[in-house]
Amino acid sequence: MLTQEHINIIKSTIPLLESAGPALTQHFYQRMFSHNPELKHIFNMTHQKTGRQSVALFEAIAAYAKHIDNLAALTSAVERIAHKHTSFNIQPEHYQIVGHHLLETLRELAPDAFTQPVEEAWTAAYFFLAQVFIDREGALYLERKQALGGWRDGRTFVVREKQVESAYVTSFVLVPADGGAVLDYQPGQYIGIEVTPEGSDYREIRQYSLSHASNGREYRISVKREGVGSDNPGLVSHYLHNNVKVGDSVKLYAPAGDFFYVERERPVVLISAGVGATPMQAILHTLAKQNKSGVTYLYACNSAKEHTFAQETAQLIAQQGWMQQVWYRDESADDVLQGEMQLAELILPIEDGDFYLCGPIGFMQYVVKQLLALGVDKARIHYEVFGPHAQLAA
């Protein structure tokens, strides 16, 4: 049971956490994977190499410590993380393993400060939060299993179509091998896909945004070939592009995600860059089915060859009479602006519009800064980060 004394002790350890920084979570992951290598089948090891996951986990732990006396402030974070966990098929027993290694990490990095009262407080705090996640994730699993076309664990799907969308993005249309219905989803959500690439010692699970409106029959994901020309090419994305063919099978976990279009009587502005167009495409198709008016689509990429869904989007926008503006950073073209996206030059629904963002973190930070400067209410800015979460604005 989490007591007031525990809360007081946790808050007193905040300076210790802040002084340790992400080194704490780096040590935690190294320890956990050393003792429990089977978890490498679940965690994205690429994010371990880049350090993004360590930073994201540290920020989550620090936020929990700071808000442990006001857990309502963490509601949105809990929902986001719970959805992501279900796309990895996280189970209650995993929390026991994580808790053990987190507590041992604190003991090893701060042996003098990790007194018995501190250990008891962090043990109570961790397992209190773990139960919050277990309960929420259990509810999500049950809800999806009981819904039409739903399922609980992995389900086998077959690649029905494979379509090149741009220089680095290819779409895969996936249908269930059992011939049954598929679970509906909200436009903007993602699915977890599990594969075992050639040369990999582990099963690999990745999340990809669904890029078409829900129809109860099939899913479409649109995958960017990551790290082209780099020393660290995307393991799963390259495997999907190079090896997975029409007729091949993959395992999917049910649609998840707390970023999605919410129907309101407001104008809608969709802003994306690069492969960030994928969830926006699902939203666009959904808005078209609703005959939604007052939609603005803003998109940026490097060049025409990297313009994902160019024709598909143009057709939708022309049919619906919506507004579109595109920027190419490296070249000019008809009806396309060159350079960086400049929102002040456009007529936008600043006072009442809902703004949905997706793309590289630097791009979204740049856009959010502009939106806030223009007077857009922060509550009307919604965004999706591919990979470990990051804050875009204070």
Curated annotation (Swiss-Prot):
Record-linked Gene3D superfamilies: Globins (1.10.490.10), Nucleotide-binding domain of ferredoxin-NADP reductase (FNR) module (3.40.50.80), Translation factors (2.40.30.10)
Domain FAD-binding FR-type: residue ranges: 152-262
Record keyword Transport present: yes
GO molecular function: FAD binding; heme binding; metal ion binding; nitric oxide dioxygenase NAD(P)H activity; oxygen binding; oxygen carrier activity
Annotated EC: 1.14.12.17
UniProt catalytic activity: 2 nitric oxide + NADPH + 2 O2 = 2 nitrate + NADP(+) + H(+); 2 nitric oxide + NADH + 2 O2 = 2 nitrate + NAD(+) + H(+)
Known role: Is involved in NO detoxification in an aerobic process, termed nitric oxide dioxygenase (NOD) reaction that utilizes O(2) and NAD(P)H to convert NO to nitrate, which protects the bacterium from various noxious nitrogen compounds. Therefore, plays a central role in the inducible response to nitrosative stress.
The protein, known as: Flavohemoprotein
